[in-house]
Amino acid sequence: MKVLVLNCGSSSVKYKLLEMPKGDVLAQGGVEKLGLPGSFLKLTMPNGEKVVLEKDMPEHTIAVEFILSVLKDDKYGCIKSYEEIDAVGHRLVHGGEKFSNSVEITPEVIAKVEECIPLAPLHNPANLKGVVAIEKLLPGIRQVGVFDTAFFQTMPEHVYRYALPYDMCNKHGVRRYGFHGTSHRYVSARACEILGLDYDKTRIITAHIGNGASIAAIKNGKALDVSLGMTPVEGLMMGTRSGDVDPGVLTFLMEAEGLQAAGISELINKKSGVLGVSGVSSDLREIEDAIKNGNERATLAMTMYDYRIKKYVGAYAAAMGGVDVLVFTGGVGENQYTTREKVCTDMEFMGIVFDSKVNEGMRGKEMVISKPESKVTVIVVPTDEEYMIASDTMTILK
């Protein structure tokens, strides 16, 4: 079964064509600068070669049409007919309280996703444009929606509620939803598969650490807690997002700096985090270079970044009454050994006995990085959200 996975953003469309159930990647790439001058499609050939194809793509339907044409292209493609594509799976960011599982997309589902647009005004409309494009270009093909938020619908009310007026929160749908759910679901299940553990009887902390970042507590197969809240700003310090901050600071800055709501939103989403503290970059590779050159603010930013992760790991271990497995994933979690080491150092009281030597040589592959005597297994699992979306698509449509 060939499943095309689409992740449509406001100015990008990422795609992957997978042969299921094996999960073999037949084609992958993405459109960038969608709707802007100089838009292009960047694809990865089977031999690993990167190819850039420039084309004016003012909107999503044209972008998806170009992706489909490249999939069938004699030089760059891997299929002879669109009929070889059996189904399309979409990343849908926000399902609110309406979706606790992945679903086949119907007009009723689209209407419910549209009702969630106020919760994700940038993401949901773009996600739906991908659905509409496929309906137009591949009429009759079945489509499945996989929600970032669905995995966290198992969080109990005392976890997802904010300590704000009860009726006001209900009126506006204000609560913690969590994000990166597809990634947390994949790496937690995959870690148990690698380690031979029963997923439904294991306490797992998953750290999805990239430019956006979140930590989740998963107990006996269900999400108990996650650091991201109603929006992807709560929790950990991120590339440009602040993470946890005293709300009183924001009202203070509104008055002190003359900021309106839009200005505060830009401040905490785009000007804070590692970039805001360091003044250098949101990219941790550039931060590490700055640290080597003696930049004190870069050092401070990195120390804050690692400390926040460590603090959440301890909190979630307490929330679950202990932890059996700690998983690192995401661009930083998979590739930056220094952050993993800082998080796991001096954690013997919690049962973590870290293997620094194994950790230092580990980048981007599945590997246990704790010592055999460690009560908590620390493991790196590269995330594969596209495989998870394709897997859900296959399961639902079969």
Swiss-Prot record:
Molecular function as annotated in GO: acetate kinase activity; ATP binding; magnesium ion binding
Protein residues bound to Mg(2+): N7, E385
Major localisation: cytoplasm
SUPFAM superfamilies for this protein: Actin-like ATPase domain
EC number: 2.7.2.1
GO BP: acetate metabolic process; acetyl-CoA biosynthetic process
Record pathway: Metabolic intermediate biosynthesis; acetyl-CoA biosynthesis; acetyl-CoA from acetate: step 1/2
Keywords associated with the record: ATP-binding, Cytoplasm, Kinase, Magnesium, Metal-binding, Nucleotide-binding, Transferase
Family assignment from sequence similarity: Belongs to the acetokinase family.
Name of the protein in its database record: Acetate kinase
Protein's organism: Porphyromonas gingivalis (strain ATCC 33277 / DSM 20709 / CIP 103683 / JCM 12257 / NCTC 11834 / 2561)
Upper lineage: Bacteria, Pseudomonadati, Bacteroidota, Bacteroidia, Bacteroidales
Gene: ackA
